[in-house]
Curated annotation (Swiss-Prot):
Pfam families according to UniProt: Bac_DNA_binding
Gene responsible for this protein: ihfA
Keywords: DNA recombination, DNA-binding, Transcription, Transcription regulation, Translation regulation
Family: Belongs to the bacterial histone-like protein family.
Species annotation: Rhodopseudomonas palustris (strain TIE-1)
Protein name: Integration host factor subunit alpha
InterPro entries per record: Hist_DNA-bd, Histone-like_DNA-bd_CS, IHF-like_DNA-bd_dom_sf, IHF_alpha
Gene Ontology MF terms: DNA binding; structural constituent of chromatin
The keyword Methyltransferase is assigned to this record: no
Region (Disordered): 97-118
A single GO BP: regulation of translation
GO CC annotations on file: cytosol
Length: 118
C-alpha cells in the first residue's frame, strides 16, 4: 500500500501553490511549523491538531530484550518514544473509499506468507 512519499519540498510547494506566499516564505512557514512541533515534543508536550491527530511522547521503562542472532538476553535502556495517534476524522477519511488496492509487491508478500503458514 506504499504510495508517494511527500517531502518538505512538496509541503513547501503546496503552501506556495495554495496560499500564495512566495517560495521563500512558504519554505520558512513550513520550517517554522515543523520546528514548533519538534520543540513541543522535545519538552514532552502533546501536540494535538484537530481533525488530524496527536503527536505525543511516551516514556518506556527499562526491560530485558533478546538478541535475535544469539538468543542472549540484553538490557534495553529506558527511553522516550514519539507516537502519532490519528483522529477519528482522519481514520474515516483514509478508509472512506474502502481499503486501497495493494501494490503488486505487497500482494506477492501476502501470498508468500499465506503459503508458508505465516
Amino acid at each position: 500500500m506504499a504510495g508517494r512519499t511527500v517531502t518538505r519540498v512538496d509541503l513547501c510547494e503546496a503552501v506556495y501553490q495554495k496560499v500564495g506566499l512566495s517560495r521563500t516564505e512558504s519554505s520558512a512557514f513550513v520550517e517554522l511549523v515543523l520546528k514548533e512541533i519538534t520543540d513541543c515534543l522535545e519538552r514532552g508536550e502533546t501536540v494535538k491538531l484537530s481533525s488530524f491527530g496527536s503527536f505525543l511522547v511516551r516514556q518506556k521503562g527499562q526491560r530485558i530484550g533478546r538478541n535475535p542472532k544469539t538468543g542472549t538476553e540484553v538490557p534495553i535502556s529506558p527511553r522516550r518514544v514519539m507516537v502519532f495517534k490519528p483522529s477519528a476524522i482522519l481514520k474515516q477519511r483514509i478508509n472512506a473509499n474502502g481499503a486501497m488496492p495493494m501494490s503488486t509487491e505487497e500482494s506477492d508478500e501476502n501470498t508468500a506468507q499465506s503459503a508458508s503458514g505465516g
